[in-house]
Amino acid sequence: MDKQIEINVSDALTETPVRFRIGKRDFSIYPPTLGKTQILKKLYLELDINAGLLALNPLAETMRVCKEYPDIVCRIISYSTFADRKNLLNVEKVYQRAAFLKDNTSVEDLATILSVIFSSDKTEEFIKYFGIDADREQKARIGKIKGEGSSLTFGGKSIYGLLIDFACQRYGWTMDYVLWCISYVNLNMLFADAITTVYLTDEERRQFGKGGGTVVNADDPGNKDLVRKMISDYDG
């Protein structure tokens, strides 16, 4: 068990904000929702971030963008300190807070806060930690073995069908809730680790060397060895 990742998972699940102080004022960086992520996405594009340098030397690249684009950085931080849709869409309030940040912080302060925001999305880290990436590979291989049969699938080409529709259909949430009321990390983890069931036909069971008309839940950790054995038997 990786204690730090477990702590990160708990913080993500409970949507715990990161707090900081500027002068006598306290602020919180709230986990971004899907709606906030879309707002920030436009500002990130304006920063002209060098993804290669950010991966190689995140502190240096973060310092650079804070020096070159302080106004945009302060707006990003300002947006990140609001939690609800009403405040996020209140442009005047966002700009007022951004102006306060610019007048009361150094480049180093901005870089430190921006680094926290940049590193807030730990979805891929969680996916690897829980072995969900391995499940994805297994399901992809099983999909190839099973083939398409007589079914055709359409849609899921954009975030509307892939994530928003998934959440609304599965949990009965409104689009407004999906956009503004659940963190982007939690939303992505619900999608990535959703339980699915794979039904094996008689022919497929014959190919896998398994009989008995079993329905195999490929997302159940207890079935991982069985699924791997099925794939191994088929490949062998």
Feature map (PLM): residue ranges:
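An amphipathic, hydrophobic-aromatic interaction surface with interspersed Lys/Arg
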Residues: 1-71, 75, 79-104, 108-206
